[in-house]
């Protein structure tokens, strides 16, 4: 038995909750992975996992073993990284998840610089506004805006985006330009961004004399994807509140006009996030370091 590989197979099953997903993430047949875990249990003379037709449950002994093995694997990864980083260019495959407008307007335009620096790295980019499960979703990290509330994740702040309210000149000519946020309640057509998770509309947020102000009214149109949300505004359907970087090009051409600029809310924080349990490989380290260098100016908008 290759004990190190068996340990890696076991930890991946625990993290993903599935033999199939674990095998896929390790690029090995499920039969091979299952044999490794069974050999590990036989070697330890301990049942680590309970298997049913629907799910895999970690035993108490299995969880204790997982926590100890994880530290060993992280130490091994750190040792390898320390020696490789000084003499080798990073190689391999990164799986990154990012929201739609952030991918289109910030990350993808920056990627030529990344690939010029690290030509031996490959990236699979998952683009969706709906958050992924970092443990079972088989991704190395995600780039997300907004507050973080999961203590099991490690987050690095990589910039702040300004939020703006805007509409087309045609819409504003027909409906008038609101002079202050409360006027949005007076007959204006609002295009709300809907949470991809809950379906609820996010309120329009502003600052009034330094204090947060939220405007929540029934929306004319609700959209749960950031690129479609912007497209609705460009179609003249109403007023949106969006990231400055998403509207930047359209503000320059005059296709959109910012309104209520004196009431802009606080900047929206962005983070790159990964699980505490995920081994921080050399390739992920260089990607995060690169993000920290180039992302803040691009996301600011």
List the predicted regions and their residue ranges.
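A short LG(V/I)-centered, amphipathic sequence patch enriched
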Residues: 41-60, 256
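Short helix-loop hinge/linker segments at domain boundaries
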Residues: 53-56, 63, 74-97
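Central regulatory/effector-binding core of bacterial HTH transcription factors
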Residues: 91-154
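Short alpha-helical elements of helix-turn-helix
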Residues: 1-16, 34, 63-66, 70-73
């Amino acid at each position: 038995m290759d004990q190190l590989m068996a340990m890696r197979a076991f930890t991946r099953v625990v993290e993903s909750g599935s033999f199939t997903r674990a095998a896929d993430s390790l690029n090995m047949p499920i039969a091979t992975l299952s044999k490794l875990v069974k050999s590990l249990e036989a070697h330890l003379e301990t049942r680590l996992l309970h298997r049913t037709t629907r799910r895999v449950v970690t035993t108490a002994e299995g969880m204790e073993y997982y926590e100890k093995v994880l530290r060993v694997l992280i130490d091994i990864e750190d040792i390898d990284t320390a020696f490789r980083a000084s003499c080798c260019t990073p190689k391999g495959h990164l799986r990154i998840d990012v929201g739609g407008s952030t991918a289109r307007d910030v990350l993808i335009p920056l990627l030529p610089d990344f690939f010029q620096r690290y030509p031996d790295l490959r990236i699979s980019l998952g683009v969706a506004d709906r958050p992924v499960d970092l443990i079972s979703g088989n991704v190395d990290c995600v780039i997300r805006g907004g507050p973080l509330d999961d203590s099991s994740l490690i987050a690095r702040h990589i910039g702040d985006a300004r939020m703006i309210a805007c509409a087309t000149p045609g819409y504003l000519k027909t409906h008038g330009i609101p002079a202050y946020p409360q006027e949005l309640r007076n007959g204006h057509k609002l295009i709300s961004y809907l949470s991809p998770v809950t379906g609820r509309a996010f309120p329009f947020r502003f600052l009034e004399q330094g204090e947060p102000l939220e405007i929540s009214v029934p929306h004319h149109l609700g959209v749960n994807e950031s690129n479609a949300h912007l497209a609705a505004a460009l179609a003249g359907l109403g007023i949106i509140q969006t990231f400055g970087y998403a509207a930047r090009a359209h503000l320059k051409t005059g296709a959109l006009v910012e309104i209520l600029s004196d009431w802009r809310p606080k900047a929206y924080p962005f983070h790159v996030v990964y699980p505490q349990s995920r081994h921080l490989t050399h390739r992920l380290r260089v990607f995060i370091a690169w993000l920290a260098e180039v992302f803040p100016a691009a996301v600011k908008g």
